[in-house]
Amino acid sequence: SYEVEFPLASITRPVLIENIFYEFDRADLTPASTTALDELIALLNDNPNVTIELAAHCDYKGNDAYNERLSQRRAESVVRYLIKGGISEDRLTAKGYGESKPKVVNKSVLKTAPFLKEGNVLTEEFIKTLTPEQQEICNAINRRTEFQVLRTTYGLYK
């Protein structure tokens, strides 16, 4: 059992949604993803004037076009789950970034990847300089879903 807490993000900074898992090479959410997504639904219900972008990212494996399509389908999968949970579609934007926005290492990443340094950018070129085990850890870090607050005025000015 684990607890998921999402601080309401500043408008300029994306927030990683921990524990979102997809079937390999697919956009289907695994059952293990529901806890984190249910917490996000609660956060959105507590903040009804917020609109967000759900951003999905891939590792560098596969070609750019394929990764962009896969990440878009994954972001849409999260949006569908949130809509089923009662969140208005108007408040949600799905965006797949493929491998175009590699993760920049921060203090949180260092907890699971202490061989990295804060500020490292997990590009394909950088990752290929690491050991095979470290490469897989970095690829897993790049395979992520984040949300970013777009507006805090939804429904205020009708």
List each language-model region with its residue ranges.
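Periplasmic OmpA-like peptidoglycan-binding domain that tethers envelope proteins to the cell wall
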Residues: 57-158
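Periplasmic peptidoglycan-binding/tethering modules of Gram-negative envelope proteins
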Residues: 1-51, 90, 108, 112-113, ...
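Conserved phosphate/oxyanion-binding catalytic-loop motifs
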Residues: 54
